Amino acid sequence: MGIDPGLTRCGLSVVQAGKGRAVYPVAVGVVRTPSDMPVEQRLNKLFDAVEQWFDDYQPHVVALERVFERSNVSTVMNTAHASGVLMLAAARRGVDVHMYTPSEVKKSISGNGRADKAQMTRMITRILGLSEAPKPPDAADALALAVCHCWRAPLNHLVKGKL
C-alpha cells in the first residue's frame, strides 16, 4: 500500500508485486478533508478512511512518503499530523511502514531524483500500464510510493540481512 500523506488530500493506493519488476495496480484513491473542519476531526476522518482501506485490501506493508521541510511550516505540521495518524493505523494492524523521501521515489521511478510531477505521472502511468493518468497528483504519488517499495524492498531486505 502506498500513501502520499496530506491533511487536505491524502493519496492511497494498493498494488500487487509480480515477478521481477512487474507491479499491478489494484486500487487508487484520494481522501479529502475540508480545510474549514477542525484539525482533530480531519485527522479522525483520515484515520477512518485508511482503516477502511486496510479492511478492504488487507495490505502487508505500507510505503509512506517521509515528511520533509517545506517553506510553509503550517503545511509541514499538517502533513506530519496526517503521517502520524496513518502510521498509527498501520501499527494497530501490525503492518510494517517503510518511509521514502520524495527524491528516493523519483529516482526509483524515473531515474531522476529531481523529476517533476508531470514526468512522474507519465512514468507511473506507463509502468502500471494504465489507460489514463491517475488524478489528482496525490493519487499518482501514492502509486509511485507503492511501486518504489516493491522495487526496493528485495534490496532493502538483503542489505538488512548482511548488516
UniProtKB/Swiss-Prot annotation:
Enzyme nomenclature, EC number: 3.1.21.10
Molecular function terms, GO-annotated: crossover junction DNA endonuclease activity; DNA binding; magnesium ion binding
Record's subcellular location: Cytoplasm
Swiss-Prot/TrEMBL GO biological process terms: DNA recombination; DNA repair
One cellular component (GO) term of this entry: Holliday junction resolvase complex
Residues at which Mg(2+) 2 binds: E65
Cofactor: Mg(2+)
Catalytic activity, as annotated: Endonucleolytic cleavage at a junction such as a reciprocal single-stranded crossover between two homologous DNA duplexes (Holliday junction)
Residues annotated as the enzyme's active site: D4, E65, D138
Keywords per UniProt: Cytoplasm, DNA damage, DNA recombination, DNA repair, DNA-binding, Endonuclease, Hydrolase, Magnesium, Metal-binding, Nuclease
SUPFAM superfamilies cross-referenced by the UniProt entry: Ribonuclease H-like
Residues that hold Mg(2+) 1 according to the record: D4, D138
Cofactor binding remark: Binds 2 Mg(2+) ion per subunit.
Top enzyme category: hydrolase
Subunit structure: Homodimer which binds Holliday junction (HJ) DNA. The HJ becomes 2-fold symmetrical on binding to RuvC with unstacked arms; it has a different conformation from HJ DNA in complex with RuvA. In the full resolvosome a probable DNA-RuvA(4)-RuvB(12)-RuvC(2) complex forms which resolves the HJ.
UniProt function note: The RuvA-RuvB-RuvC complex processes Holliday junction (HJ) DNA during genetic recombination and DNA repair. Endonuclease that resolves HJ intermediates. Cleaves cruciform DNA by making single-stranded nicks across the HJ at symmetrical positions within the homologous arms, yielding a 5'-phosphate and a 3'-hydroxyl group; requires a central core of homology in the junction. The consensus cleavage sequence is 5'-(A/T)TT(C/G)-3'. Cleavage occurs on the 3'-side of the TT dinucleotide at the point of strand exchange.
Similarity annotation: Belongs to the RuvC family.
Protein name as catalogued: Crossover junction endodeoxyribonuclease RuvC
Organism: Corynebacterium jeikeium (strain K411)
